[in-house]
Swiss-Prot record:
Higher taxonomy: Eukaryota, Fungi, Dikarya, Ascomycota, Pezizomycotina
Organism whose genome encodes this protein: Aspergillus fumigatus (strain CBS 144.89 / FGSC A1163 / CEA10)
Name of the gene this protein is made from: plyF
Keywords from the named record: Calcium, Carbohydrate metabolism, Cell wall biogenesis/degradation, Lyase, Polysaccharide degradation, Secreted, Signal
EC class of the enzyme, as a word: lyase
UniProt protein name: Probable pectate lyase F
Catalytic activity as recorded in UniProt: Eliminative cleavage of (1->4)-alpha-D-galacturonan to give oligosaccharides with 4-deoxy-alpha-D-galact-4-enuronosyl groups at their non-reducing ends
């Protein structure tokens, strides 16, 4: 369990208060397989009523990177998605074009990335509240924009990274992540941030079994490979 202060994330022990739901993926009320992405307009709310959505058998191509057209849901700026289960048959889970809100969104088996956030600007905030993700061989949350991502009371199991600030986007910037009340089991780092671009991370009441829940990278721009350069400590 850790907390931190921003700028250079410094982790210190705190009282246990991890609130990620540990009862598994909820039982779906219905199942919808769609041939095309579902778009949620700017500022609108899509309440799935605990139905499961996917893109049909064979949609997942492993770690082959897709785009928003391969996602199950595409949220325009300010949109909200809630009470939904994203099934295993998908290449991309949820794409946000600008800041968005996800409330109780569950991913039963992540393919490439569960959540991709892009085109958010400095000062704008994305909220991921409740929900969780299983079997993400790489990232759960991929942050390509320049705002702040808040991850609250989330549950992750069998994952590579819960959050990653883009390591090699063509245009780089400072990004911020705040993680609170989250449980992360059988995985790697909770957050990976780019030290050289001034990223900040705050972890509060996070329960993780990773030896290094917060990792520093040297990010780069374009066709390059970011390098791991250290760990947050305190």
């Amino acid at each position: 369990m850790w907390s931190s202060i921003a700028a250079f994330p410094v982790l210190v022990p705190v009282a246990l208060a991890c609130l990620g739901y540990e009862g598994g993926v909820p039982t779906p009320t219905a199942h919808h397989s769609n041939s095309a992405v579902i778009e949620v307009a700017a500022g609108q709310v899509f309440d799935a009523g605990w139905a499961k959505y996917d893109r049909g058998s064979g949609a997942c191509k492993g770690q082959s990177e897709g785009d928003w057209k391969d996602a199950v849901f595409y949220l325009h700026s300010g949109a909200t998605l809630k009470n939904v289960i994203i099934g295993a048959n998908q290449a991309e889970g949820v794409h946000c074009d600008g800041p968005c809100t996800l409330q109780f969104v569950w991913f039963e088996d992540v393919c490439e990335d569960a959540i991709t956030i892009k085109n958010d600007k400095a000062g704008q905030e994305t909220w991921i509240i409740g929900g969780g993700a299983y079997h993400a061989s790489d990232k759960i949350v991929q942050h390509n924009g320049c705002g702040t991502v808040n991850i609250i009371n989330f549950y992750a199991e069998d994952y590579g990274k819960v959050y990653r600030s883009c390591g090699n986007c063509d245009k780089q910037c400072k990004r911020n992540v705040y993680v609170e009340g989250t449980t992360a089991r059988n995985g790697g780092e909770v957050v990976g941030i780019n030290l050289n671009y001034g990223d900040t991370a705050t972890l509060k009441n996070v329960c993780a079994d990773s030896a290094h829940p917060c990792v520093f990278y040297d990010g780069c721009a374009g066709d390059c490979e970011p390098k791991k350069v250290g760990y947050c400590s305190g």
